[in-house]
Amino acid sequence: MEWRDEGVILGTRRHGETSAIVEVMTCGHGRHMGMVRGGRSRRMQPLLQPGNHVDVSWWARLDEHMGTFTIEPLSFAAARLIETPVALYGIQLAAAHLRLLPERDPHRGLYETLRLIIEHFDDPLAAGELLLRFEVMMLEELGFGLDLKECAATGRKDDLIYVSPTSGRAVCREAGAPWAEKLLSLPSFVNDTALRASCYDDLDRAFTMTGYFLMRHVWEPRAQTPPDSRSGFLNAVGRAINLSQAS
């Protein structure tokens, strides 16, 4: 059994004296584990860092075996990612989300969004927006997609500013006004890819919304808590935006 694909390194752990078990999010084969012989060598360690874009070949005698990887560099991002808290927490958060999915289950859209996130870590607001969309996609891929295109009460497709915590459906301003305190906020950029998050408050409200549904449908049923990297990422984005506005 063998295949070749491109991927992003998510994590590495020691295996024996010289080898490493490497976790890669691939384009066509999902999140995949494999052993890299000599993975702890000085030559290989810089390559096997989270965030790096790699060419990966996998081989195993049987499909159910972990198998071995042969990994070659396509682009190095890890050195840049460890320079800022936004990038460091961001790649950790993306990896934590991807580990909610079954291993070897292909998710090309998530892979492509992961690549975009890594490319935009130098813009905290853009990185936050992309990771928010990543969480919305995660809910969809896990079977808990949100319906944010029209009002659950009226069918209107404009002025959607709330989300029902019960149904996960959008609610327009007029229909939601009497129950505003019980509804989740829906910033306009979440629904319209042509719009950008205008400030940190937009991101914070959007992440509160996705966090509610991740907790309800994913973390709590699995007896899990939100990853520390999630709050770390949001705090880092907030600090970076404040610093840029002050300068």
UniProtKB/Swiss-Prot annotation:
GO terms (BP aspect):
DNA recombination; double-strand break repair
Q: Name one Pfam family in it.
A: RecO_C
Against InterPro entries, the record matches this protein to:
ARFGAP/RecO (IPR037278), DNA_rep/recomb_RecO_N (IPR022572), NA-bd_OB-fold (IPR012340), RecO (IPR003717), RecO_C (IPR042242)
Gene Ontology cellular-component terms for this entry are: bacterial nucleoid
The entry's keywords: DNA damage, DNA recombination, DNA repair
User: By its UniProt entry, which NCBIfam families does this protein fall under?
Assistant: reco (TIGR00613)
Purpose of the protein: Involved in DNA repair and RecF pathway recombination.
HAMAP family reported for this sequence: RecO (MF_00201)
The record's similarity note reads:
Belongs to the RecO family.
Question: This chain belongs to which protein, by name?
Answer: DNA repair protein RecO
Gene symbol here is recO
